C-alpha cells in the first residue's frame, strides 16, 4: 500500500512540476482501493496535462529524472513482489505497446504483444 501511495504522490509531484511549481506532498496511505483509485486519478491528471496545449513548467528531462524514474523503480518493486507471490506480470514488447493518451486506468485492452516466454530461437523485440 505504501508503494502505491508513494507513486500517487510522485505523479502529483510530476503534475505540479509540469505546471511550473514543485509541490511535494507526502500523503498518508489510505485503504488499498482508495490508494489504487488515487494513483489512477493522479496518473490521469498528469496525462491530461501533458496531452494539452498548456506549457510545460519543467523540462522533459526533469520530469523523467525525477518523479517518472522514481515511479519506474517502484513499478519494478511491484513486479518483483508479484513474481514472489506466483502472480508475475506478463512480459511484453513495450516498443510495440498500444499506448494512448487518456487510457491510464486499471482496465486495459488485451495486448497482442504480451507473452510468458519468448518463442524458441527468437527474441522478444
Residue ranges and their predicted role:
Residues 1-26, 58-117:
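Short, contiguous alpha-helical
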Residues 13-54:
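Helix-adjacent hinge/juxtasegments
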Residues 51-58, 115-125:
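Long, charge-rich low-complexity segments
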Amino acid at each position: 500500500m505504501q508503494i502505491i501511495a508513494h507513486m500517487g504522490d510522485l505523479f502529483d509531484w510530476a503534475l505540479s512540476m509540469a505546471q511550473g511549481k514543485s509541490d511535494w506532498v507526502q500523503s498518508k496511505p489510505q485503504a488499498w482501493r482508495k490508494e489504487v483509485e488515487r494513483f489512477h486519478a493522479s496518473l490521469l491528471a498528469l496525462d491530461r496535462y501533458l496531452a494539452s496545449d498548456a506549457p510545460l513548467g519543467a523540462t522533459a528531462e526533469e520530469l523523467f529524472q525525477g518523479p517518472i524514474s522514481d515511479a519506474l523503480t517502484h513499478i519494478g518493486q511491484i513486479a518483483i513482489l508479484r513474481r514472489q507471490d506466483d502472480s508475475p506480470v506478463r512480459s511484453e514488447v513495450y516498443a510495440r505497446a498500444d499506448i494512448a493518451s487518456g487510457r491510464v486506468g486499471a482496465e486495459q485492452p488485451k495486448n497482442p504483444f504480451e507473452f510468458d516466454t519468448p518463442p524458441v530461437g527468437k527474441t522478444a523485440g
